[in-house]
Amino acid sequence: MSLASRRKVRIRLYGTNPTDVDQVAREIVDLAKKMGVQVRGPIPLPTRRLMVTVRRAPSGQGYHTFDHWEMRISKRLIDIEASERVLRRLMTIRVPDTVKIELQLI
């Protein structure tokens, strides 16, 4: 396979369920290794914490009590030196609704 037909692809996975993100990353790495492609990753990126603090009581009366809600966004990064054939196979992987994928050609 010539160098012109191979491209470096950066895959970013992110989602609210870390087990789903890890499962999709593992499937991508396993598929790439089975196809004989050079893989780097999955590289865990920092988890982003989104916090929202809301007042429990709708009125201003009573004690000042608050609820804290948190959402964590887990991210993984995978670099693959892939051909068009490998990219087509990557598109067939089943991805849960909680995981989002970004592909970037480098």
UniProtKB/Swiss-Prot annotation:
GO terms for molecular function: structural constituent of ribosome; tRNA binding. Keywords: Ribonucleoprotein, Ribosomal protein. GO terms for cellular component: small ribosomal subunit. It comes from the Archaea. GO terms for biological process: translation. PROSITE patterns: RIBOSOMAL_S10. Pfam families: Ribosomal_S10. HAMAP family: Ribosomal_uS10. Part of the 30S ribosomal subunit. Involved in the binding of tRNA to the ribosomes. Belongs to the universal ribosomal protein uS10 family. This is Small ribosomal subunit protein uS10. It comes from Pyrobaculum neutrophilum (strain DSM 2338 / JCM 9278 / NBRC 100436 / V24Sta) (Thermoproteus neutrophilus). The gene is rps10.
